[in-house]
Amino acid sequence: MLANESVARCCTGLRRDKIRPPLRSLGVRRLTESFKQGDPIRWRLGVCAAIAMALLALVPQFHLWASRGKDWQGTFVSFDFDEVVYASYLNALTSGRPRRNDPYTGRDDAPNQPQPESLYSIQFVPAYVLAMPARALGLPSATTFILLRALAAFLATLALFWLLMLITGDTQLAASGAIAVLCLGGLAGEPRDAWRILTFQGVGDSLPFLRRFVPASVFFLFFLFAGLVWQALVRLAPQVRLTYAALAGLTLAILIFSYFFLWTAALAWLFIVAMLWLIVRRGEPGSVIAVLGVIMILFAAALWPYAVLLSRRDSAMDASQLLTHSRAPVFSFPVIIGLLVFLVLATAVWRGWLRWKDPAVLFATSFALLPAVAFNQQVVTGLLLQPVHYGRYSANYASVLAIVIVAGLICRARASGSRLPSRVLAFVTIVIFSWSALENGARAYRLGPQSRARDDARRVAMRLRELSQQAPSTQISDQSSSLVFCSNLWLGDALPNDAPQPVLWTPHLFIFPGSSAEENRERLYSQLYYSDVDEEQFAALAREPSFLQLAVFGWERMNQKPYAAPIVDADVQKETNLFKDYLTNFNAAQAARTPLGYVIVPATNGSLSNLDLWYRRDAGERVGDYILYRVKLR
């Protein structure tokens, strides 16, 4: 009665017989009170935190703008090797090309030449969400990516703020926690990054979730999904529960067609929450099953067309995405962090500070256990697909989120229900935010020469775009007149960000199904041959981490992952012998298999002795630091 009287005094105007019994969870009680009071200030800190994170996300771009000044050519700063591929696919869609397209080979889906599904055409939602407004506004892919980086940070911060506010009921903790999760999530992905901090070294990209356009564009949906599931489980009215469950199911359905490593992580997390809820809170199985049923019905409805698209994928897609068969467990850094958090949580329950039945405790437990489940699903399924992505884009953030929730719950329990001191939260937040800003600024400074070189090289892509607009509409699809050889591989990789012409070979050519594994190898050898690479240089590149080692042996073997076979001398010698045979037998017929239309070389080092044996070059056109040639077969 005393508890009910207390609630009645706080909720004036309500009849005593209409007041529901108070919820045991402090987070749920505060949530209920905030809804009744309608306090408009509770979002103010969240919006401020989101704006701060958006500005933090743009620090590298600010650095490029300041260093280039009026010479800026419109390039976006990139910290991730794969961003140029997403920008190329986005540019293709913005240019009106079909969903199944290959921006590197220039091959599009057509009735007389159907293309198989690719990773990008299956996960099409983010691409079209960006491409449609970009096309309507006439925005190039680079500008879209710049805007997306800020918007993604803003939305992710707001989603995290909302989720933490639901769980903890503490607005200040929610704002500080959102910043902490986003700034420290990258650090939780790799143990070597923690060591670099202790030794005052740079940790690299401290905000990996901002990789564009995935997971950046849909990253916030993971936390939105968790918040909707919370609402569906803790709300009292059945109709409200089912409404939130339906919204959660729709969010999960969108994630399915957005990014594999987010929707599978969300599904694994939902499984953990469901098991915890059914085991610990046995008194409400009917409502929990109803909520899960609604979510799973919508999930299954989306999974069916997804499976159909997946069945139409290219046969080489599994190999290009490094799908392997293994049941070996993986103990990554996020897994260790999550298990340690779970141990702390269990200790707090054992000491009587917390209770398992508290929904906030169950949610903290679910986030702590998510890395162990996500990284080790192969123990059950037998399939292992690039688990490193869980460590960069989902499980690492879940482990830090668990730390924030557990820290807030324990501190509140030890302080007899009072909130964490505002000054402590402010100090910790400022330290974390300042460190992340320093890391982003330092990395932008270190990569400044590369960013400026990419920006200057964009002149070449824009010149090719101009030439395509001057050419007949059928010429671009004709590889004999438009195929580009670029001796600078990183420039060639980025050319399709703006230019519609296909390229001979780039490190990302294998990603799309436009070329088979055999054609990809043929194009690689041609690229090396025209670049005057001999067998000794080939062997040297194959022995060390390089674009060649990546192309020949794959990312996971190059990075010496424990579940991948090591690269030994016999492997290098075998590949070198194959390339040597190619050099020895190269002839006019092989040159004609992939006829070139354009050649791009640096203005200071444009040796093309092998290419000149088979092609005639025009006088060339100086474009920035490069020379653009038009070539024809002899």
Kindly give the residue locations of the regions a language model identified.
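Transmembrane catalytic cores of multi-pass membrane glycosyltransferases
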Residues: D82, A253-N376, V380-P387
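Active-site lumenal/periplasmic loops and adjacent helix-entry segments of GT-C-fold
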Residues: L56-L221, F260-T264, G441-S451
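Transmembrane alpha-helical segments
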Residues: L55-L64, L303-Y306, R423-R452, W505-P507
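Extracytoplasmic
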Residues: E83-V84, A442-R634
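Start-transfer (signal-anchor) and selected internal transmembrane alpha helices
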Residues: M1-V7, C11-S67, Q172-A175, R634
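Short hydrophobic alpha-helices at membrane interfaces in multi-pass membrane enzymes
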Residues: L26, L228-A253
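Signature aromatic-anchored transmembrane alpha helix within multi-pass, membrane-resident enzymes
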Residues: P22-S25, R30, I51, L292-A300, ...
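Hydrophobic/aromatic-rich transmembrane helices and adjacent perimembrane loops
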Residues: T264-W269, L384-R414
